[in-house]
Amino acid sequence: MIDFHNHILPDLDDGSKSLEMSLAMLRTAADQGITEIINTVHFQHPKVDGMDISMERCSEKRELLYDEMAKEGLSIKIHLGTEVFYLPNLVDIINPLTTFGHGKYMLIEFLSHQIPDAQQQVLFDLKMKGVTPIIAHPERYKPVQENISLVYKWLNAGCLIQLDAGSLTGSLGNSARITAMEIVKRKLCQFI
């Protein structure tokens, strides 16, 4: 099984805070049957403003983690990727760090309380460049909680939808859980 959206590499963003925390996360993942993880460090997000989020730094963190994993006999493969914060510049930042699947996909996160109207054109422009947008955890966005038709618009525009497993369990709040369940019921998501 592949964990598609994870912040496992230490000290890069608001995910793992230490090597020990990353190893604990990996032990849990292994117990759950996960064999591969796509690390999706935040990119151009206000949470990481001013931090060095580069392919080199991510690779260094992964190698450090691999060394420690080998000592514990953990053999989960970690792929490098990002969760790109929506700004109108998405087409201009297509590169190996901001995309995955050989440049074919970009995981995109919006503000929890606002989905800009301009995003429709930006997502279309990404598609025209051969990059399929994957909308990260839409069930957590207030505009989607209030109007699920936004998910249909994204799907009709060729986007894919990724839900957060924590939303389905209720650990991210009741509104996210209700919206996630509705998205699943309507068969609108491709990744959990």
What name fits each language-model region?
Residues 189-192:
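Short acidic/histidine-rich active-site segments
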Residues 173-183:
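Short loop-to-alpha-helix "cap/lid" segments that border enzyme active sites
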Residues 48-162, 176:
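Extended substrate/RNA-proximal surfaces in nucleic-acid metabolism proteins
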Residues 30, 127, 184-185:
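Non-catalytic positions within long, well-ordered alpha-helices that form the structural scaffold/packing
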Residues 142, 168-170:
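Short gly/pro/ser/thr-enriched loop/turn and capping motifs at secondary-structure boundaries
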Residues 6, 42-43, 83-84, 138, ...:
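Active-site metal-binding loops of divalent metal-dependent hydrolases
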Residues 7-16, 148-155, 163-166:
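Metallo-beta-lactamase
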Residues 1-74:
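An N-terminally biased module of ancient metal coordination in phosphate/nucleic-acid-related enzymes
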